[in-house]
Amino acid sequence: MKTTDVVAWFGTKKAIAEACSEDGWKLTAAAVSQWGEEPPAGRQKQIAALTKGQLTAGSAPSQPETTPAQPSEGQQEMTDNRIEDLNIESIATLVTPTQLKEEMPISEQAVESVCKGRQAIRDILDRKDHRIFVVVGPCSIHDVDAAKDYAQRLRDLAEEVSDTLYLVMRVYFEKPRTTVGWKGLINDPYMNDTFKIQDGLHTARRLLIDLAELGLPLSTEALDPISPQYLQDLIAWSAIGARTTESQTHREMASGLSSAVGFKNGTDGSLTVATNALMSVANPHRFLGIDQSGQVSIVSTKGNPYAHVVLRGGGGKPNYDSVNVQIAEDALSKADLAQNIMIDCSHENSSKNPALQPLVMDNVSNQILEGNKSIIGLMVESNIKHGRQNIPANLDDLEYGLSVTDGCISWEETEDAIRKMREKLKDVLPGRTAG
């Protein structure tokens, strides 16, 4: 029996030390009785072996950083380490969604902001609101102060263009990686491979509350199927990325999200995975998840009627042009889906060159001027400064307001592009109707 198994039953190193004889960590009957209960029958042989000296002086386990789970009442066998969890190093208990929300309750002001944001986006998708909604902001959040700085600027711009464009701040905490790399603020908030996920959840929720209280509608990518229980109450629009659009887990999750959700086409440019996702997410599902108390549960959803496609390019080619938009319209029509199309101005639609994003925005404006009725939204990767930076070994060397993931356009470029779009579309959008 491994020393980790001893820890799993008797708790911490300290508890074992107090329960065992001083001459060599031999477990005795007193060690069992100290815990006030007899061990399960399946552990009798293991404890007997330990009392014969298999756990000797010098093999005392070091204090684990996490507390392994205790056996449930009535459990007859402990995990057989010959066949289970062979590649698991440790399992740590996490704050529950309820506990986090009790620590950081959402204010009435933030609730009002979320409700207004969700309704505005639903109205745009239903063609009750003539505006285009623009999800704009950093590729990922790594600096809370810079995010708040950006949000203040965006709020002012949002008010300026609100008659034509509905601006939604992009607040992405989770990053899918093609291979390896920094997975975002929730996974590694200190950017030093310490992976303090609980701290990441606290930081993310605190920031979302602060931004919602500014009156900004907020968006994020729903990547981890657990995190929405901690954060979704603050989100007005969600994205499912190109790498996960085909995932059954993410389709099921999206069917229960409270916000509208955009599904990107596949990384190869395929529309089929996105249209299949839209058909799936509109229907009820039952799947395994967690409830607000963190209990593993069977989740039954109603289906999400506000899912739509996001064209982001793929296979090394863009797909924002009028020809590809028409192809997407035809695919949606064939699948009997609403012709709601969002254009991602970044990724392969800009050849991963942030400087090309304003050109994509201008092209989309021209399509609408020429009569397009299916484009209802845009995504723009924008930050305070233009470009990107690698994460330095010394985090003090990070440049303020500069992305650490995908390259972004600067704030000045963002203002200019959005104002130009508003100027082009302000007269034509009020008369625009669904085709």
Regions found by a protein language model. Name each.
Residues 369-435:
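Active-site or pore-adjacent capping/gating segments
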Residues 52-70:
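Short C-terminal boundary/hinge segments that cap the last helix of small helical domains
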Residues 79-83, 151, 164-320, 324-325, ...:
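Active-site-facing alpha/beta catalytic cores
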Residues 21-39:
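Recognition helix of helix-turn-helix/homeodomain-like DNA-binding domains
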